[in-house]
A protein has these predicted regions:
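Beta-rich, aromatic/charged-enriched effector core domains that present basic-aromatic interfaces
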Residues: 1-104
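Catalytic cores of enzymes that engage adenine nucleotides and/or redox cofactors via long glycine-rich
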Residues: 57-238
């Protein structure tokens, strides 16, 4: 078997890691990832003095700054996308969701452009506002790179390398929008930490998680969760 480029860790490494532990936790896994991959490390210690700057990733976006949130530059359509949209509209017209407009890149070139757009336009504010919610706003300062990594248009290693290289560029460091350690670490944590941890957990416990009912719930989700009328703002509005 060829190794899967969609993830940084191999399944064999994850199995070996889990075999030594009765339970595993994301924080421990992430620290091991940082050490093993030698990412954001200085003399064996975490750059910036701590492993996670998660506490610095929870700021609200001030109303006076909401107009500064950059718009995403969505990719242009092409004949193959048009053909796919027509096919889905014809054969799956009753399916949930909309086929248009095209939101995500579908080529390697467009995916690379999307990645660079994030680094230049949104990366510097990613850390501060990673957990922020704004009414009627979807993207904020997020990278929106997961779809491209999931289907192989970008690899996680490629994304991490690009982020580290961009943050360490002299012109970026000396600019009005340098990449703080909170932004850089927070972004790296999502990819080498959470994304890899959840893949490892899913490989090991996926069947149990899919078929289990840990909380003993038996009621169906009400219609309000689907049409956005729960009265809970983050669900209805964001």
């Amino acid at each position: 078997w060829l190794s899967c480029q969609n993830f940084i860790n191999t399944r064999e490494y994850n199995e070996q890691y889990r075999s030594t532990k009765k339970r595993w936790f994301m924080a421990d896994f992430y620290q091991q990832q940082r050490k093993r991959l030698d990412i954001l490390m200085e003399d064996g210690k975490p750059e910036g003095g701590k492993w996670s700057f998660d506490a610095d990733n929870r700021k609200k976006i001030p109303k006076a700054k909401r107009h500064l949130i950059p718009d995403l530059e969505f990719p242009e359509t092409n004949p193959w996308v048009d053909e796919a949209e027509a096919y889905v509209s014809q054969h799956f017209n009753d399916a949930i969701g909309d086929v248009a407009p095209l939101l995500y890149p579908v080529t390697f070139e467009a995916a690379e452009t999307w990645l660079q757009g994030f680094l230049v336009q949104r990366f510097s504010n990613f850390g501060d506002y990673e957990d922020a919610l704004v009414p009627h706003q979807t993207w904020l300062y997020h990278s929106v790179l997961t779809p491209m990594m999931n289907i192989g248009l970008l690899t996680p290693q490629q994304v991490v390398d690009a982020a580290l290289q961009y943050a360490n560029r002299a012109d970026v460091i000396d600019s009005d929008g340098p990449i703080s350690i909170a932004s850089l670490e927070g972004f790296v944590r999502q990819i080498i930490g959470w994304r890899e941890f959840m893949r490892a957990t899913y490989d090991d416990l996926g069947a149990t998680m899919r078929s289990g009912n840990h909380w003993g719930h038996h009621h169906r989700l009400p219609k309000s969760f689907y049409d956005g009328t729960t009265g809970i703002a983050p669900i209805d509005d964001v």
